[in-house]
Amino acid sequence: MNSRRRSENMNTSSQQERPKISAFEGEFHFLSNFYPAVVEYRGRRWWTTEAAYQAMKTINEEEQNMLQMVRAPALAKRLGKTVAVRRDWDEIKEAIMREIVQAKFDQNAFLQDMLLATEDAIIEEGNWWGDTFWGICKGQGLNKLGNILMELRDGYLGQVKKENI
């Protein structure tokens, strides 16, 4: 583990405070939807969680097929801005994100182990591009993705504790 990178992205102000992961880069890149982890979701295989998420914005089969072929998460995100967005997207996008992110960690044991290794750290999807819904920008935001990751981690920790009883 690169201690310099850890000190840049995992901060603590005092011994009593929980550590904080403030960026999904370096050793914490695996938390990002841009991380190259194949995921099976809704009967399809996706190269990244980003591609799966962007594809779920639409009910157009051709647009979903196009996104399924995309390996580069930045391209998937860009293409996701061009699809015909389903009417109920705002109501379902959080549940979709949760399902996709859970599938990523359920299906990739080494990633689940890495998530568990964050222990009780606060996970923030810190960004500079202004996403205050899924993350935190300039100290502001709902951090929905970070919250999903912490809830998943807590669920996995609960499973581990049950297995060890």
Task: List each model region and its residues.
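Charged, low-complexity intrinsically disordered segments
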Residues: 2-165
